Amino acid sequence: QIPVLSGYAEHAFDSEYALKDASFTVVDPLQKSSTIKADNALKSVTVFDLLLPTDGTYKISSKVNYPIKYALHNKVWKPFYEVSAQDAGELAKRDYVIADDFPKNQPPSFQEIQREWTLESYVTKNKVSTLNAKNDAPIQVSFSVHPNQIKVNQAVQLNVSKSGKPLKNAQVKF
């Protein structure tokens, strides 16, 4: 078995917040699916033990969402955060707005959305195996090589699609 750690992070491998009420789907090398509910009280990371009884690749996935409040500022919708002006700094240097960015006599128009993430990770025990599991994420990403065989300085082609059709102008960040 191995520990699986996940969380919200601005920088890779530096989790800041645990995933609340996260449920993980695990597809084993034999294509059997199971669900794991992480049960921990940590604030910075969500942790669970993953049993690896069979050699091959395990796909771990989860869907999480988080409500985000947007405010209309100068005809542009921007994320709205409850932060003091002192902590936020200059408006020109940030991509969000706070209450102090609006005139006192003109409350902002708000809109709340649910931001949803589909998280996927792959763990391989001893040897890689074919990934056959159906992907029901709104946006699918497939690799030209097995995800656990990607190496530093190796070119990898990604296919990004939505509803089975190529997604035009997709932006990918690593």
Located regions from the model:
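Short amphipathic beta-strand segments in non-cytosolic proteins
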Residues: 24-34, 171-174
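Short, ordered, surface-exposed loop/turn motifs in non-cytosolic proteins
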Residues: 17-20, 164-174
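Short solvent-exposed capping/turn motifs at the termini of beta-strands
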Residues: 8-12, 160-162
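Exposed aromatic-hydrophobic patches
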Residues: 45-52
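Short acidic/polar inter-strand loop motif in beta-rich domains
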Residues: 64-75
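Short beta-strand segments within Ig-like beta-sandwich modules, predominantly Fibronectin type-III
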Residues: 35-42
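Beta-strand-rich domain onsets/edges
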Residues: 1-2, 91-156, 161-168
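Extracellular Ig-like/FN3 beta-sandwich strand-entry sites
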Residues: 55-57
